[in-house]
Amino acid sequence: MEYRTDQVPMSPRSVQGAPGTLPIRDHLPWSIFNLFYMNVCCLGLTAMIFSVKSRDRKVVGDVEGARHYGSTARSLNIAATVLGILLIIILIGLAATGTIQALKYKG
């Protein structure tokens, strides 16, 4: 194989942010998960709205607004996840004790 001089070898580059700044997180994947699987009291939907607002603020360049909306989305996602897990545990406990039954056989 012949090496051509008119081609420049490509190497992966990493983009460095400003030193001392933390990346702005919008928690969008977590919000999508909570929207579709653990939408307790519409907390997943609200978290999704705040995640999108955070991403929009990040695109515009409003760092403080993006951090605020991202923090709110994080708090709502935590609440939705905890309430969803508690609901699942309560339902499993009620089903195990026989308080609720999924199917009744009428024979």
Swiss-Prot record:
Chain ranges on the Extracellular side, renumbered to this chain: 1-31, 99-107
Membrane-protein topology: Multi-pass membrane protein
Recorded GO CC terms: plasma membrane
Keywords, sorted A to Z: Cell membrane, Lipoprotein, Membrane, Palmitate, Transmembrane, Transmembrane helix
InterPro entries referenced in this protein's UniProt entry, alphabetically: CD225/Dispanin_fam, IFITM_antiviral_protein
Subcellular location: Cell membrane
Cytoplasmic face of the membrane: 53-77
Tissue occurrence: Expressed various cell types in torpedo electric organ and muscle, especially fibroblasts, capillary endothelial cells, and axonal cuff cells.
One matching Pfam family: CD225
Source species, domain of life: Eukaryota
Annotated lipid attachment (S-palmitoyl cysteine): 41-42
Transmembrane regions: 32-52, 78-98
Record's keyword annotation contains Iron-sulfur: no
Family of this protein: Belongs to the CD225/Dispanin family.
Protein name in UniProt: Dispanin subfamily A member 2b
